[in-house]
């Protein structure tokens, strides 16, 4: 079973759009253990501690449907999974090179703030799938 206390989102910058912040807060109420940190820069050494999994979001990454994403996250067993979202310039190639996976949410390009909301919804959906919750309908 996938649990939100094993998942964290680290993003560069703050959410400025109120409607996106409201959407994120709705999912945070459903997953209070999910860590969401707004940073100025990524410190890969801290995020890598204890063999944590690093997943960078980037439009050139690998795409999964929701069920596949759930399976992928479940395969990481009891490791902590850190999702990294860059700012308007994305994530540096150095950080991408040192990540375990580069994930694309879609072939479309999204503003980084909207990507956070989409990722949080997909995390909630993956947890729901792993718990056989009726939220996900395939």
Swiss-Prot record:
| A matching Pfam family | SPOUT_MTase
Kindly state which reaction or reactions the protein catalyses: pseudouridine(1915) in 23S rRNA + S-adenosyl-L-methionine = N(3)-methylpseudouridine(1915) in 23S rRNA + S-adenosyl-L-homocysteine + H(+)
Q: Which of this chain's residues are annotated to bind S-adenosyl-L-methionine? A: 57, 86, 105-110
Asked if the record carries the keyword S-adenosyl-L-methionine, the reply is: yes
- Which EC number(s) does UniProt give? 2.1.1.177
- Identify a single GO molecular function assigned to this protein: rRNA (pseudouridine-N3-)-methyltransferase activity
The chain's coiled-coil residues are none
Give the enzyme class: transferase
Q: Name one GO cellular component term.
A: cytoplasm
Where is this chain primarily localised?
cytoplasm
Sorted alphabetically, the keyword list is: Cytoplasm, Methyltransferase, rRNA processing, S-adenosyl-L-methionine, Transferase
Locations listed in the record: Cytoplasm
Q: Which CDD domains does the record match to this protein?
A: RlmH-like
**Keyword Manganese found:** no
Protein family membership: Belongs to the RNA methyltransferase RlmH family.
Write down the PANTHER family for this protein, in alphabetical order. Answer: METHYLTRANSFERASE (PTHR33603), RIBOSOMAL RNA LARGE SUBUNIT METHYLTRANSFERASE H (PTHR33603:SF1)
Q: How does it assemble?
A: Homodimer.
Function summary: Specifically methylates the pseudouridine at position 1915 (m3Psi1915) in 23S rRNA.
Q: Which protein are we looking at?
A: Ribosomal RNA large subunit methyltransferase H
Provenance organism? Prochlorococcus marinus (strain MIT 9312)
Organism taxonomic ancestry? Bacteria, Bacillati, Cyanobacteriota, Cyanophyceae, Synechococcales
